[in-house]
Amino acid sequence: MIEVQTTSQLQEQLQDAREQGKTIGFVPTMGALHGGHQSLVRACAQTCDLVVVSIYVNPLQFGPHEDYHEYPRQLEKDRVLAEEAGCDVLFCPTDEEIYPDGYTQTVHVKQGANVLCGKSRPGHFDGVATVVLKLFMLVQPDFAFFGEKDAQQVAIIKQLVKEFFLPVTIVACPTVREDDGLAKSSRNANLTPAERQVAPKLYAALRDAAKSPTSQLSDLVQQVRQHLAALPLGCIDYVEAYEYPSLKKVEQSDGIVILALAYQFSKARLIDHILIDMNNRNGGLNDVSDNDESKIASCTGD
């Protein structure tokens, strides 16, 4: 594995691969890597000749009172985990490399940006779309791999690629979970031991609601809220349901629905969701445990 910090160093590493006709795969991250990130890198390595992983904590997607400075940074450990999973080129740029002239040009996202996480985080997805577009322009990958855990982000990035005619295939891979159902997340490190015991109940609430026979999205939301209201720690940020991937608000649906939540613990805001086929109410479409990475092979690209 080769580590680079500057865009010129990155281009030097990519030039040979392009000249040799190799397929380039890309996994953008904010670091604090875990098993979920590694599953994306492995899926990328199975598909592509050259695997590029970026580690960059993007300040533009954090609000003024959010956890930018508290976001975990562990570059030494990240290097080991990235290489172990199959990374060939690790790109760790500075703010000056990504925003050499400051925030003079940014992407403004309209569709799907003001619901779910975007409702309480104005400008968040503008920051996400801006940095992803910049990284795509730098790496120019054939494939880019994202986790379905951030389903809203995946939907927005797919639309970004479509709107800007970017020649990259977006591959969405199932959420990787701990054995108790908690979605793997860098923010889990900020949970207290007591909060860590409570956190798996978030996904349990979503799964219970997904099996409900109701066709009303508002009923699904209410069921989840009732489960969460009984938890001894933390508080609800939101529980919402939308058509997916359009993220349009509807009362009923006979297609795919995203039932999503955000929950605030003392120093960690966790998100989770489940995708529900409203014609098949036996549970969600996006379950994968940490010891079942074979399902990663079913990642789908658009």
Curated annotation (Swiss-Prot):
Subcellular location: Cytoplasm
Binding positions ((R)-pantoate): Q61, Q153
Gene Ontology molecular function: ATP binding; pantoate-beta-alanine ligase activity
InterPro entries: Pantoate_ligase (IPR003721), Pantoate_ligase_C (IPR042176), Rossmann-like_a/b/a_fold (IPR014729)
Broad enzyme group: ligase
Residues at the catalytic site: H37
Residue stretches spanning the membrane: none
Keywords, ordered alphabetically: ATP-binding, Cytoplasm, Ligase, Nucleotide-binding, Pantothenate biosynthesis
Cellular component per GO, a single term: cytosol
Pathway note: Cofactor biosynthesis; (R)-pantothenate biosynthesis; (R)-pantothenate from (R)-pantoate and beta-alanine: step 1/1
Binding site for ATP: 30-37, 147-150, 176, 184-187
PANTHER family for this protein: CYTIDYLATE KINASE/PANTOATE-BETA-ALANINE LIGASE (PTHR21299), PANTOATE--BETA-ALANINE LIGASE (PTHR21299:SF1)
Subunit structure: Homodimer.
Similarity annotation: Belongs to the pantothenate synthetase family.
Extra remark: The reaction proceeds by a bi uni uni bi ping pong mechanism.
Designated name of the protein: Pantothenate synthetase
This protein's encoding gene: panC
